[in-house]
Amino acid sequence: MRIAGVDLPSQKKLEVALTYLYGIGKTLAKEILEACQLSPDLRVRDVNDEQSMRLRQYIEQKYLIESDLKRVESMNIKRLMDIGCYRGRRHRALLPVRGQRTRSNARTRRGAKKTVAGKKLAK
């Protein structure tokens, strides 16, 4: 089964397979299956065409997923950077945005250490 350009693994249960879509986690997958009146224990390979069409239409109408969601997220970050607010400046400087300390740690966000040469001793 294919939803929003993503192939869902056929051997997995529907509840788990839906989490392969960017923007859908376990809780949202349960809500979607409940709204579409599908069993969470149903395997992807056992879903018939009518059920898959109902599921696909419900997801595409109600939720932003995959590339649409990624585009909205990147536009939000770009807007923060354009208006020059604190969060935008932190994004631009590739530093942690949510108040984490940077004196030690923050290596993932800041990248690998840049070694600075020490003072040379005169002999």
From Swiss-Prot:
HAMAP family: Ribosomal_uS13. Residues 99-123 are annotated as: Disordered. The gene is rps13. GO terms for molecular function: rRNA binding; structural constituent of ribosome. InterPro entries: Rbsml_uS13_C, Ribosomal_uS13, Ribosomal_uS13-like_H2TH, Ribosomal_uS13_bac-type, Ribosomal_uS13_CS. The keyword rRNA processing does not apply. One of its GO terms (cellular component) is small ribosomal subunit. Located at the top of the head of the 30S subunit, it contacts several helices of the 16S rRNA. SUPFAM superfamilies: S13-like H2TH domain (SSF46946). Residues 100-123 have a biased composition (Basic residues). The keyword Ubl conjugation does not apply. One of its GO terms (biological process) is translation. Part of the 30S ribosomal subunit. It holds the Pfam family Ribosomal_S13. This is Small ribosomal subunit protein uS13c. It is found in: Plastid, Chloroplast. Keywords: Chloroplast, Plastid, Ribonucleoprotein, Ribosomal protein, RNA-binding, rRNA-binding. PROSITE patterns: RIBOSOMAL_S13_1, RIBOSOMAL_S13_2. Belongs to the universal ribosomal protein uS13 family.
